[in-house]
């Protein structure tokens, strides 16, 4: 916004015939508030059990769904946080929904969820509408999509130093066309690909995504319209074939992403922290 004219100022003007600009106000959002230092434990029925296998591991688990599904949900808020929280037997530890920006979720554990393992279950840390959301140093166990961005979510959004164990599926941009995501020093499976007719016909799931110095099995491709990047994946042998290519052989377009230093970590150790240091100095990183 130009200080002299109070009108929007665009640094790189572009002609977009279908675009409009509108004044935006966040006056009614919750701001400068947080949830911290909590342990959330949900009761559940132990009458139902189920078995499933994923990536060569057999699991037996409780299958009750008549209990708490979400630990903390953020919506219509800015400059907010969730930290030092542990949830037990709950599908989603933290859900970020629409109208959220400048949010931090850190040092949160999502443990031993109780539910089925089909669609829309065990999305431990999910972003379905937040922008400028930082997830850092979080942990999920017995998860499906541990660290996930849903469809049409506009970034930038960051997952930093997060970890998943005993996954039924992958950390990933999910559904259709979320943009501007960074997975940085994450330990766990990460898939960025054309999901084709998977789920509810997801198609291209992520655009302008970057994977940086991660560890674990991975898939990465890009659409013809937006680049995705991979830097410093720990082991080239962790690359997997595109999942949906096996469903409809030869008909699922997945174009090679921009890849650098596959099999060898890169310097700096963290892309996000280096950019933070460059912008705000070492004090911001130490904080």
Language model segments and positions:
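Short beta-strand-centered aromatic/proline hotspots
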Residues: 1-7
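A structural detector for beta-sheet-dominated domains
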Residues: 7-9, 41-43, 75, 97
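Right-handed parallel beta-helix
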Residues: 31-42, 78-89, 100-115, 129-145, ...
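Catalytic P-loop NTP-binding/switch module of NTPases
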Residues: 7, 14-31
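Catalytic domains of carbohydrate-active enzymes that cleave complex glycans
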Residues: 160-162, 179, 184-287
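Acidic/polar low-complexity surface segments
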Residues: 12-16, 36-68, 111-124, 195-201
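Glycine-rich beta-solenoid repeat tracts in large extracellular/virion proteins
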Residues: 23-28, 47-51, 70-76, 92-99, ...
């Amino acid at each position: 916004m130009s200080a002299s004219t109070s009108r929007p100022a665009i640094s790189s003007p572009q002609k977009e015939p279908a675009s409009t600009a509108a004044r935006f106000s966040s006056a009614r959002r919750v701001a400068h508030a947080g949830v911290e230092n909590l342990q959330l434990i949900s009761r559940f029925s132990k009458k139902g059990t189920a078995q499933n296998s994923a990536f060569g591991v057999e699991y037996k688990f409780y299958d009750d769904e008549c209990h708490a599904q979400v630990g903390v949900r953020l919506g219509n808020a800015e400059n907010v946080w969730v930290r030092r929280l542990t949830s037990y037997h709950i599908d989603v530890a933290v859900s970020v929904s629409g109208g959220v920006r400048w949010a931090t979720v850190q040092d949160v554990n999502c443990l031993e969820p109780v539910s089925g393992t089909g669609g829309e279950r065990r999305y431990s840390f999910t972003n379905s509408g937040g922008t400028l959301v930082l997830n850092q140093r979080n942990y999920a166990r017995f998860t499906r999509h541990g660290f996930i961005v849903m469809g049409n979510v506009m970034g930038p959004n960051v997952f930093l130093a997060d970890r998943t164990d005993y996954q039924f599926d992958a950390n990933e941009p999910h559904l259709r066309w979320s943009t501007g995501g960074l997975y940085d020093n994450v330990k766990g499976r990460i898939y960025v690909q054309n999901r084709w007719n998977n789920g509810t016909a997801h198609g291209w799931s992520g655009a302008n995504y970057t994977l940086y110095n991660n560890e674990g099995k991975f898939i990465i491709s890009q659409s013809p319209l937006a680049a995705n990047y991979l830097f410093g994946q720990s082991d080239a042998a962790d690359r997997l074939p595109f999942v949906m290519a096996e469903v409809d052989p030869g008909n699922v377009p997945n174009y090679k992403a921009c890849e650098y230093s596959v099999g060898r970590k890169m310097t700096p150790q963290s892309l996000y922290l280096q950019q933070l240091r460059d912008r705000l100095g070492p004090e911001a990183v130490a904080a």
